[in-house]
Design a protein with these regions (language model features):
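Short loop/turn motifs that initiate or flank beta-strands
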Residues: 1-176
Length: 176
């Protein structure tokens, strides 16, 4: 502890005003603002109490890469996309290879697409490779926001194009 006039002062902390106080501060892992309660106690002195706040900001992230995805021809360009297929980075945290839990993201409109002459992307349900992946992703966890987007955006539509002709493919269905 600290000392005042040679008297040792012991600081203890809790995440509840009427909770158990310990010498270790409370541990918070999710983004949000938290109140920490403290007590300063010393022999022959009245305890002093107070609070301070701890704020954990959401981690700003950007899409870094998408793993290979292949499916068997079913006449549709629709793709099942899961969080484990995506890798993110954060300029703010100077971190790469960030993997999000499945509970942190949801997807819609995930489709294999092909770039057209005008630069647009259209669904591409035919067999073969050389495709791009178009999708909308929504963050379902308050622990993340998309970096570089206004006001902590939690939904973005993206086209992930690659020079790897085998990254996104549709294979022929087995003959009946």
């Amino acid at each position: 502890g600290q000392s005042v006039d040679g008297t040792t002062v012991t600081f203890t902390y809790s995440d509840k005003g009427d909770g158990d106080y310990t010498s270790d501060g409370p541990t918070f892992t999710d983004a949000g603002t938290y109140t920490v309660y403290y007590k300063a106690e010393a022999a022959n002195h009245e305890p002093a109490t107070g609070t301070f706040t701890v704020t954990i900001d959401p981690l700003p992230i950007s899409l870094l890469s998408v793993s290979s995805i292949s499916k068997t021809y079913d006449g549709s360009a629709d793709v099942t996309l899961t969080a484990d297929k995506l890798t993110f980075f954060s300029k703010t945290a100077k971190a790469t290879n960030i993997k999000l839990p499945d509970t942190a993201l949801s997807f819609s409109n995930a489709q294999f697409t092909k770039q057209q002459a005008d630069g647009s992307y259209l669904p591409s349900p035919e067999v073969g490779g050389g495709k791009a992946l178009s999708f909308t992703m929504m963050l379902t966890s308050n622990n993340y926001v998309f970096e570089g987007k206004s006001g902590g955006t939690t939904e973005v539509s993206d086209v992930f194009a690659t020079d790897d002709a085998n990254r996104f493919t549709i294979t022929k269905a087995a003959a009946p």
